[in-house]
Amino acid sequence: MKKLTIAAIAASMMATAIPASADLAIPLLSYRTGPYAPNGIPYADGVTDYLNMINARDGGVGGEMIKILECETGYNTTKGVECYEATKGEGALVYFPLSTGITYQLIPKATADDIPIHSMGYGRTSAANGKVFSHVFNFPGTYWDAASIIVKHMMDMENGSLDGKKIALVYHNSAYGKEPIRTLQELSAKHGFELVLLPVDHPGQEQKSTWLQVRKEKPDFVTMWGWGV
C-alpha cells in the first residue's frame, strides 16, 4: 500500500512538471462597431476565418492550436490600449492593431513587455528603423512610401514634371491622416508643386466645407487619405 501511495505521488508530480500544450494566443483588436466598422468588420472576419482555417486544416501551428483573443476597440485609441492591457497577460504573441493611433500608444508598452507589433503598412512610419524600434515591424511599406509612390504616379501622368501644379491632400485629421504630410511637403519643395492641406475631422460625416474648398482651390490633383471618410 505504501509503495502504491509513493508511486501515485510520483506520478502526480511528473504530471504537474510536464506543461500542457498551450494555445497560441493571438489578440485581435477589432472594430466591428462605430463609424469605421465598414472597414473593421471584413478585416476582423478575414483574420478570424484565416486563423480558424489554420486550426482546422493544419491542427494549428506546430501542433498547438491558435486562440483568438478578440477585443472590440471601436477604432478608439483609449479602448485599444484597454484591450492591450486586458489581453497581454494571456500570453499574447503579437499585436496588429489596424489603427495608427492605437499603434502609437502601444509601441512603448509592447516594447517594455517584449511583445512584437506588426503594423503592416500603417502605424508609425519611423518605426521602420529597427535600431530604434526593436519590436515594431511595418513591412512591406510605410505611409511615406505611399506618399512618394502617389507623387511619382502624378509625375508620370504629367510627363515627368509637377512644377507649378497644385495638389490637394484631403486627409483624416488624426495621427493616421497626418503621416504623409511631411513627405509631401518635402516633395513639394523638391518638385515645385503647391500642396494644399484639407483636414476632415472624425468621423467624417460632414465634408461639405472641405469640398467647397477643393472647388475654390481648383487643384490639378486631389489625394484622399481617409479610412472610410
PLM region spans:
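Extracellular/periplasmic Venus flytrap/periplasmic-binding protein
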Residues: 125-126, 134-229
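Short beta-strand segments enriched in small/hydrophobic residues
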Residues: 23-43, 98, 166-172
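Beta-alpha junction/loop-to-helix N-cap segments that form part of ligand/metal-binding clefts
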Residues: 25, 38-45, 57-129, 139, ...
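Short, internal active-site loops enriched in acidic
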Residues: 33, 70-76, 173-176
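Sec-dependent signal peptide recognition
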Residues: 2-9
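Signal peptide-proximal N-terminal region
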Residues: 45-68, 159-162, 189-192
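N-terminal signal peptide c-region/cleavage motif recognized by signal peptidases
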Residues: 17-19
